[in-house]
C-alpha cells in the first residue's frame, strides 16, 4: 500500500540515497560496494519462477512502479560505473525480508509485518481484548488514531485496513506467490558476497552485453 500511496516519496528518496552513496563511493575510492535492490524490479507478468534476464522485458507492476524504477536505476548505475571505471559494485535482489525491528506501520509496512499486525489486531477484536487494541495503537498509531481515541474512531480506521472482529482481509487476488527470507540470513549472504563474489563473476567472459544482475 505504501508504494502506491507515497509514489513521489518512494522514487525521489530512493534515487537521492542511491546517487549519494554510489557517487560518493566512487569519489572516495571505495573498493567494493553491495547494492540491495528488490524483486519488484522484474516485470509484472514475468514467467514464474522469474529469471534474471526478464528484467526490462515488459511493464512493471503499476503499484510498485516508482520504487521499482528507482531500484533499476541503482542497479544500472552500479553496472555503468563498473563498465566505465572498473569499479567493483555488486547488485543483489533480496526477496521479501522480515525480522527484528521490522516496520509494522499499516500505512508503510511490507506484506509480512502488515499481515502479522492485522491478524494480531483482528484476534484482539475477536476476543474482546480492547486493552490489547489500545496498547497496539498507542505504540503505532494508524492515520493519527491511537489508543486514546474513541472506540468508534478506532473501529472505523481498522475497518479501512480490512480489520474487524469477524474477519481480517488480506488484499490481493490470492494468486501471486510470495517468498520470504529471515533478515539475519540475508545479512550472512551479504557478508559472503562481499568476501567471495566480484562483478566479473556475475557474467560470462566474452559476453557482449554485460549485466549486473
PLM regions and their residue ranges:
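Active-site Tyr-X1-5-Lys
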Residues: 20-23, 62-95, 111-133
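Alpha-helical substrate-binding/gating segment
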Residues: 83, 97, 113-170, 178-212
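NAD(P)H-binding glycine-rich loop region in Rossmannoid oxidoreductase-like domains
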Residues: 1-14
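Short-chain dehydrogenase/reductase
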Residues: 11, 15, 54, 59, ...
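Short catalytic/ligand-binding loop motif for oxyanion handling, primarily in non-cytosolic enzymes
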Residues: 1-2, 42-44, 99-100
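Conserved active-site region of classical short-chain dehydrogenase/reductase
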Residues: 15, 19-23, 76, 184-187, ...
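Active-site pre-Tyr helix/loop in NAD(P)-dependent dehydrogenases
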Residues: 38-39, 53-55, 75, 94-101, ...
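Conserved Rossmann-fold NAD(P)-dependent oxidoreductase catalytic core, especially the SDR/UDP-sugar
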Residues: 16-65, 90, 103
Amino acid at each position: 500500500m505504501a508504494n502506491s500511496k507515497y509514489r513521489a516519496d518512494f522514487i525521489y528518496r530512493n534515487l537521492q540515497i542511491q546517487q549519494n552513496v554510489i557517487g560518493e563511493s566512487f569519489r572516495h575510492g571505495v573498493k567494493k560496494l553491495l547494492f540491495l535492490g528488490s524483486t519488484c524490479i522484474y516485470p509484472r507478468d514475468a514467467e514464474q519462477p522469474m529469471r534474471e534476464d526478464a528484467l526490462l522485458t515488459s511493464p512493471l507492476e503499476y503499484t510498485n512502479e516508482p520504487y521499482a524504477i528507482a531500484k533499476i536505476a541503482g542497479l544500472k548505475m552500479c553496472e555503468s560505473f563498473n563498465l566505465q571505471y572498473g569499479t567493483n559494485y555488486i547488485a543483489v535482489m533480496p526477496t521479501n525480508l522480515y525480522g527484528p525491528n521490522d516496520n509494522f506501520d499499516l500505512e508503510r509496512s511490507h506484506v509480512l509485518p502488515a499481515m502479522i499486525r492485522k491478524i494480531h489486531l483482528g484476534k484482539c477484536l475477536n476476543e474482546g481484548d480492547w486493552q490489547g487494541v489500545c496498547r497496539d495503537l498507542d505504540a503505532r498509531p494508524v492515520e493519527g488514531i491511537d489508543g486514546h481515541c474513541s472506540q468508534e474512531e478506532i473501529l472505523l480506521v481498522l475497518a479501512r485496513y480490512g480489520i474487524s472482529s469477524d474477519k481480517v482481509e488480506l488484499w490481493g487476488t490470492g494468486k501471486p506467490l510470495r517468498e520470504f527470507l529471515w533478515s539475519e540470513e540475508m545479512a550472512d549472504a551479504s557478508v559472503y558476497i562481499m568476501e567471495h563474489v566480484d562483478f566479473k563473476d556475475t557474467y560470462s567472459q566474452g559476453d557482449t552485453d554485460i549485466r549486473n544482475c
